[in-house]
Regions:
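C-terminal structural segment of proteins
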Residues: 1-165
Length: 165
């Protein structure tokens, strides 16, 4: 929801309200919902042409709580350069973490190993704050973030070709 810039509708007996996904998540297992509200709808805006997205998470076993995850959305201009990028991590802080500095490094860049590596390193080394768990140390979570970011960015860039209208 955060990577796709969704809007969320909260409903209660008092009525409804819409809020952007960036304002919905407040911390670890905490949202902006009041005690009498429930999440009733998630509205995803249409993706622009030449946009690709990917979500990758890593867990020890299928269905387990992920040690790290990343959602990536990239939009290319007519020349194949990155016009917009969003990277959002899960289990990288006390809530979903947007890596805006890493996304900024992709702006104006073509798909290249160096651009992907720069973004992955920026996010893993400077933007996320993994807390660790019984399954993964913070250092291992940073390593996972770097690897998953590379994979997700390559997948998202590849998927832009199928939305080239």
């Amino acid at each position: 929801a955060l990577a796709l810039e969704a809007r969320l509708r909260a409903q209660s007996s008092r009525g409804e309200r819409w809020l952007p996904a960036k304002d919905f998540f407040k911390g670890l297992f905490t949202t902006d919902l009041a005690a009498d509200e429930m999440l009733a709808e998630i509205a995803l805006p249409p993706l622009p042409p030449r946009t690709g997205a990917a979500f990758i998470e890593f867990a020890r076993r299928r269905g387990d709580y992920a040690m790290m995850g990343v959602a990536v959305v990239v939009t290319l201009d007519g020349k194949g350069l990155c016009q917009n990028a969003r990277l959002v991590y899960l289990n990288a802080g006390d809530g979903p973490v947007r890596a805006d500095l890493a996304a900024g490094l992709l702006q104006g860049q073509a798909l290249s190993d160096s651009a992907i590596e720069a973004a992955a390193s920026m996010a893993a080394d400077h933007e996320i704050e993994p807390m660790g768990s019984v399954h993964a140390t913070p250092a291992y979570q940073r390593h996972l973030a770097r690897v998953l970011t590379r994979r997700a960015l390559r997948t998202a860039f590849e998927r832009t070709a199928s939305t080239n209208e």
